[in-house]
A protein has these predicted regions:
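Long beta-strand-rich cores associated with HINT superfamily self-processing modules
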Residues: 202, 473-504
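Aromatic- and charge-enriched surface segment that lines or borders ligand/interaction sites
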Residues: 80-124, 146, 219-222, 270
Length: 504
C-alpha cells in the first residue's frame, strides 16, 4: 500500500535544510532533558484534561487518590479505601506528610474541594459525568475523606483518578491551566512560549523541557542533532525503522491500548444514516493499513475497551473488508455514482495523521464516497471536535482504564460540556445498560452489561473502530531509566536521567 522510500527521501532532503536552520541553535544544557512532543497540552488543570498531552503531563504534576495496575484495576495511590456500605466509601491518605509544591499541606479538605469543584456545574468540567453520583463528601479528619454515592458502584474508587488541587487556590480561581500547583513527582517551572514547557523533578531537581515539534521528520532530526533528548510516538514507521538502525539512538516498542476511531456527527444527514456508517466500516481495509502503514505496530480494534480488559469482549465480530457490500449499503441509502455521499473529514495537520486520512479517503472514494480532507493545527482541530463542528473526524482515546468511558462517550446526556459524547449519540438501551452496570454490586453482571453495550455500539457505529496503536520511544544513547507504560503515559520521566550526569 505504501512505499517507505518517499519518507526516507523526505528525511534526507529535509536533513540539509533543517541542519542549516538549526545549526545556529545551541545544544541544551546538560542539566535539562528535552522531550519532543507533536502537540503541547491544552491545559494543565486536571479538571479539564481530555487530550493526550494534557492527561500525560498532569499525571506528573498532580497526585490522585487512586491509580491503575496492568490489569485495569484500581489500586491505592495517594489514599487507600474501604467500602463501609455499598453507598459509602472511606479514603485514608497514606502515611507521611503530603505537601503541594507551594509548601501547603495536602489534606482531606483539598480532596473535598477538588471533587466538589468538578461536581459544580459552573466549573463545566468534562469529567463531571463520571462522578455525578456523588451526593456528598465529608472530612471527619485531616487524613480521612468520606464519599457518599446515590447508587452502589463497585468501580467507584477508580473514578477518583483526578489530580488533587489546593482548596484555597480553588476558592481564589487560580489559573491552574497555565500555572499548575500540584503535589506530584514534578513541579511546574515555566511555560515561556506556546511550544515550550518546563517542569522540575521534586526529588533531585532534574528539569524536563517539553518542546513542541509538530513535524515528525524535523523531530527526528532534532533528536539526531541532540536538540532534543527523547521523543515518544507520533512517528511514521519508516522513521522508527530508520532510528532503530541509527547509531547513538535507543528505541523501545511496547504494545498499546490507545484506541483510534472515526467519529461522526449523528445529526448530519449523510453520516447520521446507519447504512452510510456501515458502508464506511466495510470499505476500510484496516488489516492492510496496520500491516503496511504501521508495519505491524498496531492491532485492529472492535471496541474502545481492548479484549484484554476485564469488561472487554474478545468475541466481537468485526466488519469485514467488503467493498461490494459497502457499495450496496450506499445504494440502499440513496447514493450512487451520480450522487455520491459527500463527507468532510477533519484531522490534525500532523503529517502521519494526514497520510492515514489520505489512505482512508482513497478506500472510501473507491466505493462511492466523495471525501474532502480538512487538516488543522491541533488547537483548532480539537476545538472543532469538542464543539461539534464536524461531519467526520479521526481521533484516539488514550489512557482508558475503566468502562466508565462508555458513559462519558456514549450516554445520551454526556454531550459536551457534560461529557465527551461529541457525536450526539442517543440510545435508550445503551443508557439503561450503563445505568444497570453502574448500580449493580455484582462484577460479573456489570461486565456482562458493559459487553452488551459494546455489542450495540459495534452494531450502531457512533464510532467506526480502527486500531490500537503500539507505543514507540526513542532517546539518545546517553539517556537511561525510561520505561514505557501500556497506556503511553510519561511516568518513565520519574526515573529518566543522563548516564554521565552526577549521581548516575
Amino acid at each position: 500500500m505504501t512505499n517507505p522510500r518517499p519518507c526516507l527521501r523526505q528525511l534526507w532532503i529535509l536533513t540539509g535544510i533543517c541542519l542549516a536552520l538549526i545549526s545556529g541553535c545551541g545544544r541544551p544544557s546538560p542539566d535539562t532533558l528535552r522531550f519532543g512532543l507533536q502537540t503541547m497540552p491544552v491545559t494543565l488543570d486536571p479538571r479539564y484534561a481530555t487530550d493526550a498531552a494534557s492527561s500525560r503531563i498532569d499525571r506528573l504534576l498532580y497526585e490522585r487518590l487512586v491509580d491503575f495496575n496492568d490489569h485495569f484495576q484500581a489500586v491505592p495511590s495517594l489514599a487507600a479505601w474501604r467500602e463501609l456500605t455499598p453507598r459509602h466509601y472511606r479514603f485514608h491518605l497514606k502515611g507521611g506528610s503530603h505537601r503541594f509544591h507551594n509548601g501547603a499541606p495536602l489534606t482531606s479538605a483539598d480532596v473535598k474541594a477538588t471533587f466538589e469543584s468538578v461536581l459544580d456545574a459552573r466549573t463545566a468540567s468534562p469529567l463531571r459525568a463520571s462522578v455525578a453520583h456523588i451526593t456528598r463528601i465529608e472530612t471527619p479528619a485531616a487524613d480521612t475523606v468520606d464519599f457518599y454515592i446515590d447508587t452502589p458502584d463497585p468501580l467507584f474508587p477508580g473514578k477518583l483518578d483526578i489530580g488533587i488541587l489546593p482548596a484555597d487556590l480553588i476558592r481564589r480561581n487560580h489559573p491552574f491551566n497555565r500555572r499548575p500547583v500540584g503535589s506530584g513527582p514534578f513541579a511546574f517551572v515555566a511555560w515561556p512560549s506556546e511550544d515550550r514547557l518546563r517542569i522540575k523533578r521534586v526529588g533531585d531537581g532534574q528539569v524536563i523541557e517539553f518542546d513542541q515539534v509538530p513535524n515528525p521528520t524535523v523531530r527526528v532530526l532534532k533528536l539526531l542533532r541532540g536538540e532534543i533528548d527523547m521523543l515518544q510516538n507520533d512517528l511514521p514507521f519508516e522513521l522508527v525503522k530508520y532510528l532503530e538502525h541509527h547509531g547513538g539512538i535507543r528505541v523501545q516498542r511496547n504494545k498499546g491500548t490507545n484506541f483510534t476511531y472515526l467519529g461522526f456527527n449523528l445529526h448530519d444527514p449523510v453520516v447520521g444514516t446507519l447504512a452510510v456508517r456501515r458502508a464506511i466500516a466495510h470499505a476500510l481495509n484496516r488489516a492492510a493499513i496496520t500491516k503496511f502503514v504501521f508495519a505491524g505496530s498496531a492491532r485492529t480494534a472492535n471496541a474502545i475497551l481492548p479484549p484484554s480488559h476485564w469488561a472487554g469482549d474478545p468475541g466481537l465480530k468485526p466488519y469485514d473488508y467488503d467493498p461490494d457490500k459497502a457499495r450496496a449499503l450506499l445504494a440502499s441509502a440513496g447514493f450512487d455514482a451520480a450522487h455520491p455521499a459527500r463527507i468532510t473529514y477533519k484531522t490534525s495537520s500532523d503529517p502521519f495523521r494526514v497520510r492515514l486520512a489520505t489512505i482512508i479517503q482513497s478506500q472510501l472514494d473507491k466505493v462511492g464516497f466523495d471525501v474532502d480532507i480538512r487538516s488543522y493545527d491541533w488547537g483548532t482541530f480539537y476545538g472543532d471536535i469538542k464543539s461539534g463542528r464536524f461531519q467526520m473526524y479521526s481521533l484516539s482515546w488514550v489512557g482508558i482504564k475503566t468502562p466508565d468511558i462508555l458513559r462519558t462517550a456514549f450516554y445520551s446526556t454526556s454531550v459536551p460540556p457534560n461529557g465527551a459524547n461529541r457525536g450526539r449519540f442517543q440510545n435508550a438501551t445503551v443508557d439503561r445498560l450503563i445505568d444497570a452496570a453502574d448500580s449493580t454490586a455484582d462484577a460479573r453482571v456489570e461486565a456482562a452489561d458493559y459487553r452488551e453495550v459494546q455489542r450495540i455500539l459495534l452494531d450502531q457505529l457512533p464510532y467506526v473502530p480502527l486500531w490500537y496503536e503500539d507505543h514507540v520511544y526513542a532517546a539518545r544513547s546517553d539517556i537511561a531509566g525510561y520505561t514505557m507504560a501500556e497506556d503511553g503515559n510519561y511516568d518513565g520521566l520519574i526515573n529518566v536521567h543522563r548516564v554521565n550526569s552526577p549521581g548516575h
